[in-house]
Amino acid sequence: DVYLGQHVLPMLPAGVVGTHPGPFMSQSFSAQITVWGKGTHGSMPDKGVDPILLASNIVTRLHTVVSREIDAKDTAVLTVGAIHSGVKANVIPETAELLVDTRAYTREVSDRLRSAIIRIVEGECAAAGSPREPEITFYDEYPLTHNDPAVTTRVRGAFDAHFGDEAVDLGQITASEDFSIIPDALGVPYTYWGLGGFADWENAPGNHSPSFAPDLQPTLDRAAEAMIVAAAAWLVDGAA
């Protein structure tokens, strides 16, 4: 058995298929963080604890983790993608919520990111005099996509024969996927590749952008071709 999959991506020209053996897409997790302050009128900040200022300090500190705590030879990404707090200009609110996203290629680096988030959030809350402990919930955890080298080499050979110069090595990308959950659970080797979807790929919006609308052609036909070619590498007569 072998597991095959693909995903349209903005970092390749339309019609190009990109493979990569070994670690391909990063593992990831997200964190929902709620911190507490003490609400008060905006004209009397000394009477409260400002959770917006607290959250801002957390954001600043979190963004030093990759540059100051992770080995420069390792890949890591930490992004604060959302911060929510308050409803009025003249009211210091009770709480602030942050949403954090991380990426890494090894469990060790991922664990260091997780530990740093906990340490920094708890430390900043203590420094601010927060009236209660923060809540940190980790979610949306996706494993590393590690393409089997033998499977990938075989599929890449089929792509080279069929697509010629439009088959390339994509290299590692820091996006993440749940694709590997099923083959990992079944103990089945797999490969997952990218498919270009935009003629103007250098200015293409990223995945999950509301403007992400791949060119219908040649993307649709090339996607169908790629799946057929990859499957045929395993199903046609003479395949090992």
Question: For each predicted feature, which ranges?
Answer:
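Metal-dependent amide/peptide-bond hydrolase catalytic core
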Residues: L53-A240
